[in-house]
């Protein structure tokens, strides 16, 4: 849907918080999808801090745990041409924390679907909030 970036994201979608960074038109069609995400609509995305040991998505059961992970999370490592923070190319198992207006949630990448012959590329997540 609009807020996950798995459907062609409208960058002005009112409820969207995660944006697919699209394609690199300088590359051939079968390898041009960036598979990167950025925040939209005043949301902020962070990665799980590299200092966290023994992390287990399934073991997270309370919102205060998610807020702590967000507060201690790392900024996204890249910047797009608009100056927005952008992830690396995502991979299965990557973990992100999202905060928009105090609504904080945890997402883990469960699948990255790259399609070379159409524009149906997608990133699928599990979510906890």
Regions found by a protein language model. Give the residues of each.
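Generic structural motif
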Residues: 25, 45, 105-107, 125
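Acidic, glycine-rich flexible loop segments
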Residues: 59-115
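Context-gated lysine
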Residues: 19, 34, 103, 126-128
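Short, solvent-exposed secondary-structure boundary/capping segments
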Residues: 113-129
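N-terminal "domain-start" segment
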Residues: 1-84
